[in-house]
């Protein structure tokens, strides 16, 4: 017979994993309260305020809006996989300010634009709101949404050999424009 606890201990998550690579990062003072729906780490968010004046973070709703990176530290107490972590509604999250030529991060949520079959240094990327993934493109023929996106990234490495990713491939992105 199954139990709720057994299910909780044996299920493996499929949330986005990643890692901040900049030596020092700028963050939004006091973070922001997650609203709307749960948000995986290393996704782009937009900021606002609730009725009580608390800063809020919600999934980016428009590619042209000012974007921030949600990247809360994970605290592993029960041997959880890195793929089990996400930012839940109502929780306060760390919000990273994207700085061109400085902010770098690894992320597992990526896909390829038409004609791209592998990760290569020098590709460009933008965040796709519909799929909640970063789309990697050849810089000579970027995705149709790339030009209008407020946040643009440069692919600087392929990080798929790190043990903590639990088998997820990672791409390292550097902010070009934010």
Curated annotation (Swiss-Prot):
It comes from the Bacteria. This is SPbeta prophage-derived uncharacterized protein YonC. It comes from Bacillus subtilis (strain 168). The gene is yonC.
């Amino acid at each position: 017979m199954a139990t709720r606890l057994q299910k909780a201990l044996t299920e493996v998550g499929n949330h986005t994993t990643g890692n901040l690579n900049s030596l020092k990062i700028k963050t939004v003072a006091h973070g922001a309260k997650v609203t709307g729906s749960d948000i995986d780490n290393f996704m782009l968010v937009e900021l606002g305020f609730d009725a009580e004046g608390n800063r809020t973070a919600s999934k980016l709703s428009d590619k042209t809006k000012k974007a921030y990176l949600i990247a809360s530290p994970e605290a592993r107490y029960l041997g959880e996989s890195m793929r089990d972590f996400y930012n839940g509604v109502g929780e306060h999250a760390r919000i990273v300010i994207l700085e061109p030529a400085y902010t770098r991060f690894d992320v597992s949520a990526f896909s390829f634009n038409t004609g791209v079959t592998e990760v290569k240094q020098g590709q460009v990327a933008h965040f796709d709101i519909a799929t909640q993934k970063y789309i990697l493109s050849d810089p000579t023929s970027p995705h149709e949404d790339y030009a209008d996106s407020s946040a643009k990234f440069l692919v600087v490495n392929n990080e798929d050999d790190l043990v903590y990713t639990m088998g997820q491939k990672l791409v390292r992105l550097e902010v070009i424009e934010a």
